Amino acid sequence: MPLTHIRLLLNGKKATNVDIRQSVIALREQGHTIDVRVSWESADMLRFITEAIADNVGRVVIGGGDGSLNEAVNALMQQPQQDHKLEIAVLPLGTANDFATACGISNIIQSTLELAIHGDSYPIDIIRANNNYFINAAVAGFGAQVTAETPTELKDFLGGGAYTLVGLAKALGFKPYQGSITTDKGTFNGDIVVGAICNNKQAGGGQMLAPNALIDDGLMDITLLKSFSTFDIPVVLDEIQAMSHEAKFCYHFQTRWLEIDFPIKLPLNLDGEPYPTKKMRFEVLPKAIQFVLPPNCPCLVQSTQKSGI
């Protein structure tokens, strides 16, 4: 078996993790070439990706959370088109790890590094948002405001699900955002409480926002929650659970592109990173990057074909 050369790009906050060090040493002793680079600030990722391409490293492993993965994807997309063949794997070390979790990637360090070395890579979609990119999900409105403005304890509390989210939206006196949303299916004008634009199935620390989403189908999965009154809460909760295409308050649909236009800045995050904006165009870039995934990953089109869905 030829020696495998990968490069681990490790979030600096995790540099003292003893388990990572021991796993890297063990894999090196097996004959694998594993370089390690440790980031100090977000700007380091662009340099690390550029250097990996220049050094002919075939595969990089992103050791961090969804934010680190987002940095890597944006850094790769800034490279010339022919260099997008650099393969990306992830060692999930963040708080949420939504993308990795949805893909069935383990948080056990040794086994995940072994997957990064031996696993197959697959072409997957990413989504362009104006001049930025994201791999997992964009959340707008109340959900993004919570992410940006509330402490960790409240974010953890929100992980309780739709009942908590809806209850807090009213308890906090949240005011919906009025604007327009346009897709290839038409334009919606009205008040939005929450909007989620998903490439993968979950976001927000384990909330299954788009259970039918696939990362290589050329589509983004959209969830929109319209303004509602206290009396409407039972209906809203039912619609959130039903994930129906036809509803009064909570809409779910798929599209290849989407544009938003709001008169005031809308709280928005891309893979958890804040990008408040008035206008933005979202567009799927089909099979734009190569990503290392476990066998039978539930987020690929082939998984639905095997299961007969």
Curated annotation (Swiss-Prot):
Residues 1-133 form the DAGKc domain. Its EC number is 2.7.1.-. Pfam families: DAGK_cat, YegS_C. GO terms for molecular function: ATP binding; lipid kinase activity; magnesium ion binding. It comes from the Bacteria. Keywords: ATP-binding, Cytoplasm, Kinase, Lipid biosynthesis, Lipid metabolism, Magnesium, Metal-binding, Nucleotide-binding, Phospholipid biosynthesis, Phospholipid metabolism, Transferase. ATP binds at S39, G65, D66, G67, S68, L69, N70, E71, T95. PROSITE patterns: DAGK. It is found in: Cytoplasm. SMART domains: DAGKc. The keyword Repressor does not apply. Binds 1 Mg(2+) ion per subunit. Ca(2+) may be able to substitute. It is an enzyme of class 2 (transferase). Probably phosphorylates lipids; the in vivo substrate is unknown. Belongs to the diacylglycerol/lipid kinase family. YegS lipid kinase subfamily. This is Probable lipid kinase YegS-like. It comes from Shewanella frigidimarina (strain NCIMB 400).
